[in-house]
Amino acid sequence: MYMATPKRQRAGAVLVLHSWWGLNDFFRRLCDRFADQGFVALAPDLYDGRVAVTVAEAQALRATVTASRKEPAYKYLMRMIVELRGAAAVDDIGVVGCSMGGHWAYWLAQRPDLPIVATVTFYAARDGDYSQSRSSFLAHFAEADEWVSTAGIKRLHRSLTKAGRAFEFHTYPGTGHWFFEDDRADAFQPEAAVLAWRRTLDFLKQRMG
């Protein structure tokens, strides 16, 4: 795991969930950026220190780690939530997840026993029962995404609407999957990333302030 703590007054606590590349430098820097804004940020390491660079490596790594984990990923994530709450001395937290991490963020946010009041996802959609969720949602989508279907986004929209949850969806023109991750040279879109970051901070501060 990686944790970053603010030097000034704290704004809250954020669990940062990495994409299928693993806990790489981008997600460590993302934690640092949250800390600069006053948040205690903790990024669990779902791959036990291993990272991937190519899609093929990521697919293989995810499959290998999933099959070999001694502690199920969901139990590990819930344990990390306990650790984050203790480190930040807070009751409620926010969750931010990219791609695979976004799927985990939605799964966690559905659980009424978890202290999640704000959920932010990048290029991820997961249908489910959100009727017992305590969270509000902010979802960032790419305009052209080969990994997230329009149908999947519509299903998520229906699920959140049916559950009466507060949510915002934003789609960024001219972007594809991983547009927020500045280490993905083939996908990173600086202008969209800046706008998504600003919206993310505003959302978290409003929900956790």
Where are these regions (language model features)?
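Serine-hydrolase catalytic machinery in alpha/beta-hydrolase-like enzymes
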Residues: 1-88, 179-181
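Short alpha-helix in the alpha/beta-hydrolase fold that links the catalytic acid
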Residues: 30, 149-159
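Gly/Ala-rich beta-loop-alpha elbow adjacent to hydrolase catalytic centers
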Residues: 97-101, 105
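A conserved short beta-strand
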Residues: 114-124
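Short, proline-enriched alpha-helix->beta-strand connector loops that line the catalytic pocket
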Residues: 117, 132-137, 163-166
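Short beta-strand/loop motif that positions the catalytic acidic residue
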Residues: 139-141, 145
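C-terminal catalytic histidine-bearing segment of alpha/beta-hydrolase fold enzymes
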Residues: 163-209
